[in-house]
Amino acid sequence: MSWLARTFGAERRLAQALAAWNAGDHGVALDLWAPLAHRGHARAQSNMGAAFLEGRGVERDPGKAVDWLRRAAEQGDAGGQRNLALCYYEGWGVPQDQAEAARWYEKAAEQDDPDAQDMLSWMKLLGGGCPQDYAAARRWAEKAAAYGRVGSMARLGDIYHNALGVERDPVLAARWWQRAAVLGHAEAQAMLGAAYLAGKGVARDRVQALHWLERAEAGGAGELAAGFLRQARAKT
């Protein structure tokens, strides 16, 4: 069989496995992935690792998950790199190691994996497992936000609000919080409500302030929104 035929066959089986997985037929998917994974197919290895990590179609086994994910990651599979990073971050199947987590997140982020970009941005902002780097945190957050990652949108609002490596810019802060808020990010809703209450970056608007603060409270950010809500309600 030619290399092209083998490649086409592998891709066809991968597509069949993914369809089965999405339909909830996890065992069928694993039966299709396993032979490919044992033959060294990186995406199949990554998917096997994810299955063992989540305990879908097989008993959850972080050790086996790490074994498959490492094989995929070392071949350059971005999903494998991201999930291996998660294992190091959480200490699943390996000793917890923030530096190793950051290293693998960065490899995946450099391949345009938006979830890795989002997580790496957060780690760079806090200096967790890597040197604190506000410029890199902003850069990775911008990339992840472009893919719709709402946490990065909210983080960019915080970066501009708190002048973390940039000039303080209330307008940009409110703009990023708005983008995250309409997508349901409770903390961004609270901060946007506070911005409307104070007239920082947006025109002062108590109705809008109450709207977003109440949504934040309902969405689980009640502690953050509470003080602003009291102020907004006292003024109406």
What are the roles of these predicted feature ranges?
Residues 1-12, 35:
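TPR-adjacent "capping" and linker segments in tetratricopeptide-repeat scaffold/adaptor proteins
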Residues 1-6, 203-204, 208-236:
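Terminal, low-structured helical/coil segments at or just beyond the last alpha-helical repeat
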Residues 8, 24-25, 38-41, 54-56, ...:
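Short helix-capping/linker turns of helical repeat alpha-solenoids
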Residues 13-14, 19, 36, 47-54, ...:
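Hydrophobic face of amphipathic alpha-helices that form TPR/SEL1-like repeat modules
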Residues 22-31, 59-71, 95-104, 131-140, ...:
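Structural signature of tandem alpha-helical TPR/SEL1-like repeats
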Residues 35-36, 71-72, 107-108, 142-144, ...:
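Canonical positions in the second alpha-helix
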Residues 44, 80, 116, 152, ...:
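TPR alpha-solenoid repeat register
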